[in-house]
């Protein structure tokens, strides 16, 4: 009887020790990557580049995509924690709701890296992104430099995405003085749920109707919303006549730029972002010191932050940026353009 009781106690202790030491016993660092969605082209690039660098550093990556579902993302993050990840990297669909993910991770002493989008009102450990305020500045400055007066339409991103707010703040820093002088009139100011092209299409159609098609520029906050904007302009035979901004240098957007229906995009080189994020994630797992170059207040704390700088891209420099970097291939970007209109040296 005593032997049986002792054996059961030994088994129970072994089980507890096994559960508690799972992370320590694992040969490689395990990174949990919780992604909002993989529907947009750019996020697949993020995932692949992140995986590549993490594997170079000897880490294993477990990826979950929530398809824009808040409850599912929380559930998936809990599952990653249950699998014993050493660090959690989160691209939140909703920066407020994702705070519960951080709470759960903290209870298990797992550090959390907020990737590209800030998790608000939480004890998140680190934030890595592009300077989204600067993204908005670049968009608005490009349009304002080309059309300093006229009717503008503002199409923001998802209202639940903190990045969308930061982009808008950057846009308004440039545009506000001209609006105050009445050089620019904002005829519509809308937000596109989940950054959907269909939302941008609807809002732009309504704006064109209200303004009797008298619109000079549309400040679209990313390339997917720009796609919806251009579709609405095409319906009114205004594509190429109204300036349209964007962000992400998606293939479809770059094709529109060289075709002349989208004016510019903001190029955020994904590989450097994902590479830096993987390096930070590994450092967090090892409890190593991490270099930051900024801080961002998320409503709860000043979060150590590493910002990368975005670039303004239009038809004049697309070859020296997006294509030269290998982000997109020239033949893909110019696919819809007659070959005799391709850049010199690429027509053969």
Q: Predicted segments — roles?
A:
Residues 1-8:
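Bacterial N-terminal signal peptides that target proteins for export
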Residues 20-348:
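A residue-level marker of the well-folded mature domains of exported/periplasmic proteins
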Residues 9-18:
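Bacterial N-terminal signal peptides
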């Amino acid at each position: 009887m005593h032997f049986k009781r002792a054996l059961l106690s030994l088994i129970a202790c072994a089980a507890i020790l096994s559960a508690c030491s799972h992370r320590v016993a694992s040969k490689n660092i395990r990174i949990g990557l919780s992604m909002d969605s993989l529907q947009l082209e750019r996020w697949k690039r993020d995932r692949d580049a992140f995986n590549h660098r993490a594997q170079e550093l000897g880490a294993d990556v477990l990826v979950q995509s929530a398809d824009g579902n808040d409850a599912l993302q929380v559930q998936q993050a809990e599952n990653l924690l249950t699998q014993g990840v050493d660090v959690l990297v989160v691209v939140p669909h909703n920066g407020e709701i994702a705070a519960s993910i951080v709470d759960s991770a903290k209870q298990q002493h797992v550090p959390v890296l907020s990737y590209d989008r800030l998790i608000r009102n939480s004890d998140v450990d680190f934030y890595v992104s592009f300077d989204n305020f600067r993204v908005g500045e670049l968009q608005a400055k490009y349009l304002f430099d080309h059309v300093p007066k006229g009717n503008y339409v503002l199409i923001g991103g998802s209202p639940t995405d903190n990045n969308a707010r930061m982009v808008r703040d950057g846009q308004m820093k440039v545009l506000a003085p001209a609006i105050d002088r009445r050089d620019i009139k904002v005829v519509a100011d809308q937000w596109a749920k989940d950054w959907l092209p269909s939302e941008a299409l609807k809002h732009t159609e309504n704006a064109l109707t209200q303004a009797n098609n008298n619109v000079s520029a549309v400040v679209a906050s990313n390339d997917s919303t720009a796609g919806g904007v251009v579709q609405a302009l095409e319906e009114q035979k205004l594509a190429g006549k109204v300036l349209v901004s964007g962000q992400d240098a998606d293939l479809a957007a770059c094709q529109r730029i060289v075709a002349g229906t989208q004016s510019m995009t903001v190029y955020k080189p994904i590989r450097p972002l994902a590479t830096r994020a993987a390096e930070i994630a590994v450092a967090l797992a090892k409890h190593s010191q991490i270099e930051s170059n900024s801080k961002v207040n998320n409503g709860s704390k000043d979060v150590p932050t590493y910002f990368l700088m975005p670039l303004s891209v239009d038809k004049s420099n697309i070859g020296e940026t997006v294509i030269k970097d290998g982000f997109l291939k020239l033949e893909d970007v110019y696919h819809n353009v007659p070959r005799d209109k391709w850049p010199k040296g690429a027509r053969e």
